[in-house]
Amino acid sequence: MSPVAVVTGGASGIGLGVARHLAADGHDVAVLDQNGEGADAAAAALRAQGARALGVEVDVADRHSVEAGFARVRAELGPVAILVTSAGIEAFDPLLEISAERWDRIIAVNLTGTFSCVQSAVPDMLDAGWGRIVTISSQSAQSGAPNMAHYSASKGGVIALTKALAVDLARQGITVNSIAPSLVDTPMARAAEATGDFPGVDVIGPMVPLGRAGTPADIAAACSFLCAESGSYITGQILGVNGGMYIW
């Protein structure tokens, strides 16, 4: 049986790119997403390519939903060996217009959702003495971004959580790393463009030092490396897949 990889936010964008790449790598893949129909469609497409895949409707901000989703993955695919936490929401609001409710929602999905998924996956990895966790953070957590205090803070929390987890779990054979993208051409980015929250992928893309926006496949390739044996001596690191937009 192939190792089971869980990808949250796997119905579209970065998560879908990661799910496709991990399936191509030979993993069984569970696509978790709040959009249940989208998760099912993504899993069906993976199965059509010969992969063993499952779509599960999960709201990462709801702890009970997360636990139920992981229980289904175990029952239908097996224990979790790889977790990629791509589920997240963007937000663009001036500082003084960020309501408490808006703040709480961003933190609940992006940070607490990541934490809940990790807690649900790690017991299987501890039993196996092996695991890979890749969180998806953001360049905005490293450099800051206008009108994104809530989003940047949530992703900064993901970075701090990643480092703490790496220290906690290293002796158990589990690596934990984060990928911090910059501009990536996804449905979420295009939706923000359509509402006028930022100038647009085609406007910002040429400003990237490498001359283009990133793609989900760019992020997925880095994720695949971190999940493979070739990445086994890397943990606690923040990998900027950003076209040179942020250099540390």
Region locations from a protein language model:
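Alpha-helical segment proximal to the catalytic Tyr-Lys
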Residues: 123, 167-168, 232
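Short, small/polar-rich loop/turn modules that mediate ligand/substrate recognition or access, typified
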Residues: 170, 175, 234-236
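Short C-terminal tail/terminal secondary-structure segment
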Residues: 143, 207, 224, 235-248
